[in-house]
C-alpha cells in the first residue's frame, strides 16, 4: 500500500513460521535503506517504508549490516515496484519466496545470477505489484442497552465484503473514554482496515455506509473514514478521545483538520467514537487500553 501524500508505504507479509519473519525484520531494519519501522505479530510482519530509493548497509549479517534489505519503493501509475537484496538464505527469501506471493504481477532479476539461490550467493530482485491504498473505517454507537454489538456487526461487515480490488486487512477495538456520561456500556469503537485499489475506493465507502446503516440498532451511529497510511498533521484529538468529553462539534472540526471523512448521514454523537476508532485504528495494542495503559 502507498500513501503518496505522506510519502510512505506499508508492506504486509505472512510466513508459515515466526523465525523467517523475525530474522528478516531485524535485518531489514539494520540495513536501513527506505525502511522506517517494522512490527512483527506472530508469523506476520508490517514494514513501514518511505517512497523512493536510499543506500543500504547490506551484506553478511554483522554490526550495522543487514543480510536482507529493501532498497526502494517506487510508484508508477497503478504499479508499485519494491527493490530487494538478500544474501545466502536471505537471498532465497527475496529471490524465490517473495516473487511467489499472491498478487505479484511480475518479478525482474537484474542478472541471470540473481536467479540462482542458496549457498553464499547474493540475490537482487525487483517485485512489481498492483498499487493499493489504505482505508481505515471507524464505526461506533450501533447497539443499544438491549441489542447489538458494534464489534460483531463491524466484523461481519468486513468479512461480507466481496468487492474486487479490496482486501480486508484487520479489525481493531478502540477503547474510548469510559467516563463520558453518554456512551455504550464499554465505550468501545471498532476500526476496520482495508487495502484498496484506487478505482475501488468509492465502491468500498458506499458498501461500508450501506451495510452499517442497514444493520445498526441505533439512530446515533457514526461512520468515519481515513484514506492514507499516516496522518500528515498532529492533533490533540488522539488523546482527547480517550481522556476528555468531546463534543460533536469538536469531533467534526478535528476530523476536517486531519482529512477524516464522515460517511454516516446521522450527524449524531456516534461520530465522536467513530473518529476515535480511526485515530487509533493503526496504533497497536494500546488502542484497546485506557490512555497510557500498556501490557
What are these regions (language model features)?
Residues 1-295:
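Conserved mixed alpha/beta catalytic, RNA-binding, or beta-rich assembly cores of soluble enzyme
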Amino acid at each position: 500500500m502507498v500513501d503518496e501524500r505522506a510519502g510512505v508505504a506499508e508492506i504486509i507479509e505472512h510466513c508459515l513460521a515466526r523465525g523467517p519473519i523475525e530474522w528478516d525484520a531485524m535485518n531489514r531494519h539494520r540495513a536501513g535503506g527506505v525502511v522506517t519501522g517494522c512490527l512483527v505479530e506472530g508469523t506476520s510482519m508490517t514494514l513501514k517504508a518511505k517512497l523512493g530509493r536510499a543506500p543500504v548497509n547490506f551484506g553478511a549479517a554483522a554490526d550495522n549490516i543487514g543480510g536482507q534489505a529493501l532498497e526502494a519503493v517506487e510508484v508508477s501509475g497503478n504499479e508499485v515496484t519494491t527493490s530487494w537484496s538478500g544474501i545466502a538464505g536471505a537471498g532465497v527469501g527475496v529471490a524465490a519466496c517473495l516473487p511467489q506471493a499472491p498478487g505479484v504481477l511480475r518479478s525482474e532479476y537484474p542478472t541471470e545470477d540473481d536467479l540462482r539461490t542458496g549457498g553464499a550467493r547474493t540475490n537482487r530482485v525487483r517485485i512489481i505489484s498492483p498499487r493499493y491504498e489504505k482505508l481505515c473505517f471507524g464505526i461506533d454507537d450501533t447497539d443499544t442497552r438491549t441489542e447489538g454489538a458494534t464489534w460483531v456487526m463491524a466484523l461481519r461487515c468486513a468479512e461480507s465484503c466481496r468487492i474486487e480490488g479490496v482486501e480486508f486487512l484487520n479489525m481493531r477495538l478502540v477503547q474510548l473514554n469510559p467516563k463520558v456520561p453518554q456512551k455504550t456500556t464499554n465505550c468501545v469503537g471498532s476500526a476496520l482496515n482495508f487495502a484498496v485499489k484506487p478505482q475501488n475506493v468509492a465502491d468500498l465507502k458506499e458498501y461500508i455506509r450501506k451495510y452499517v446503516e442497514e444493520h445498526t440498532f441505533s439512530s446515533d451511529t457514526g461512520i468515519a473514514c481515513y484514506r492514507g497510511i499516516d496522518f500528515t498533521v498532529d492533533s490533540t484529538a488522539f488523546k482527547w478521545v480517550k481522556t476528555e468529553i468531546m463534543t460533536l462539534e469538536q469531533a467534526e472540526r478535528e476530523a476536517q483538520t486531519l482529512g477524516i471523512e464522515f460517511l454516516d448521514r446521522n450527524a449524531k454523537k456516534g461520530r465522536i467514537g467513530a473518529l476515535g476508532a480511526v485515530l487509533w485504528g493503526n496504533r497497536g495494542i494500546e488502542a484497546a487500553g485506557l490512555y497510557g495503559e500498556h501490557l
